[in-house]
Amino acid sequence: MVLRDRFTAAHPVVHPEIPAINGIAYVMFRQAGADGQTRTATVMPPGRLDRSPCGTGSSAHLASLHARGKISVGETITTRSVIGSAFEVTLLGVTEAAGRTAILPRISGRGWRFGETLVESDPSDVFASGYAVTDVWGPDAATLDPDG
């Protein structure tokens, strides 16, 4: 993650239309194979390897290939993860976002669910977003400490 942090510091990344989307989440290492497929290793915080070929990174790879004139609309690339799972990534079209060239990718492949989390809050819960000790004990909570 050190590499990601250093790159982000040197090259700030901000979405052209949604400034809240900023920074770099993952780092993808790529290697072109003799078979034309791209081998990938995507590192996610705090340093885990993604078991999939990473749809976000594969889309970014497709965009970089298009920007360098190495792929045209209608063409497909294959990205393969460290465990061998594959995505077929097709350049469906080219468009514009905030005055910048953007691509329209289609990603096909297979994924497996390995977890699910459900977080709920009751609308009548006055502490639904959490609480601090002073919320429960009041502003004079410190006076309860005989040494305090």
Give the label of every model feature segment.
Residues 1-148:
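Active-site proximal loop and beta-alpha junction motif in alpha/beta enzyme cores
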